[in-house]
């Protein structure tokens, strides 16, 4: 399978992990909480009842917060642009759904491989799977971004965009497509972080991006009167910030 072929980022994370292990054998202490978390995964040590609460609540919050992106865009666009703008965001939603599907594919797949190898005590191979999953998330997001940019009009018409909505959808999607790699990294990376036993970090990643998106929506759409482009730009910036947090966490395996 794809995850069994070592990709560039997987090799980087694996080599970094080997250096950390070498340092630890000499008696050095890991200073980052992120690193300590990967060394003490609660999934194999804590009671199931406690884990249910620990994982369920942050996961539910993360899913609800993730839905805020579209809701917040709809609210501000409805006020500043009108019903045609709202229709444009709905026309574009199948592309977001495609991103979420790919994120589930590689995020849950990578998390499963990670947990299996961690259960075997093979930390080096676990880091290898994490790196490959992250690489595939980014590459698939980039591919979907390029496909969307090159075939934008055809895709929007296929999704049912009428002529009066098409210009708004084009303006919105051309910008939001730039965030597809980061959306995949955030969503798929969240599954990898949960597999490491830290669902709270996944919640923090999503919450941070949603707050930034809300603030920037108000600024770009209502204050600067940027319309569809402002809402799209706010969404992408929020996704980039969330993805950076995810990568910073995963890089310390």
Q: Can you annotate each of these PLM segments?
A:
Residues 98-101, 213-217, 243-247:
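Hydrophobic transmembrane alpha-helices of multi-pass small-molecule transporters
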Residues 49-68, 72, 95-102, 178, ...:
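Residue-level signal for short hydrophobic patches within transmembrane helices
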Residues 73, 110, 151-152, 189, ...:
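Hydrophobic/aromatic residues in alpha-helical transmembrane segments
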Residues 3, 11-56, 114-181, 223-253:
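Short alpha-helical transmembrane segments in multi-pass integral membrane proteins
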Residues 68-71, 80-83, 117-120, 195-196, ...:
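Helix-loop interface residues and adjacent transmembrane-helix termini in multi-pass membrane transporters
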Residues 124, 137, 192-218, 229, ...:
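Alpha-helical transmembrane segments of multi-pass membrane transporters/permeases
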Residues 77-97, 163-168, 228-231:
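Interfacial/gating helices of multi-pass transporter permease domains
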Residues 86-146, 183-202:
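Small-residue-rich hydrophobic transmembrane alpha-helices
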């Amino acid at each position: 399978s794809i995850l069994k072929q070592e990709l560039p980022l997987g090799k980087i994370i694996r080599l970094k992990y080997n250096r950390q292990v070498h340092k630890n054998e000499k008696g050095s202490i890991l200073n980052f909480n992120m690193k300590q978390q990967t060394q003490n995964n609660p999934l194999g040590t804590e009671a199931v009842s406690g884990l249910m609460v620990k994982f369920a609540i942050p996961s539910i919050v993360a899913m609800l917060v993730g839905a805020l992106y579209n809701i917040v865009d709809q609210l501000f666009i409805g006020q500043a642009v009108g019903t045609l703008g709202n229709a444009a965001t709905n026309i574009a939603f199948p592309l977001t759904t495609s991103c979420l599907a790919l994120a589930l594919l590689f995020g849950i797949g990578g998390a499963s491989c990670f947990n299996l190898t961690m259960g075997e005590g093979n930390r080096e191979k676990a880091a290898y799977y994490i790196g490959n999953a992250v690489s595939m998330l980014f590459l698939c997001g980039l591919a979907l971004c390029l496909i969307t940019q090159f075939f934008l009009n055809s895709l929007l018409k296929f999704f049912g965009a009428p002529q009066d909505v098409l210009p708004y959808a084009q303006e919105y999607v051309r910008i939001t497509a730039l965030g597809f790699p980061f959306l995949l990294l955030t969503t798929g990376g969240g599954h990898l972080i949960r597999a490491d036993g830290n669902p709270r970090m996944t919640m923090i990643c999503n919450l941070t991006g949603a707050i930034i998106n809300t603030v920037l929506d108000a600024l770009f759409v209502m204050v600067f009167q940027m319309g569809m482009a402002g809402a799209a730009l706010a969404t992408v910036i929020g996704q980039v910030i969330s993805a950076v947090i995810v990568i910073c966490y995963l890089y310390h395996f």
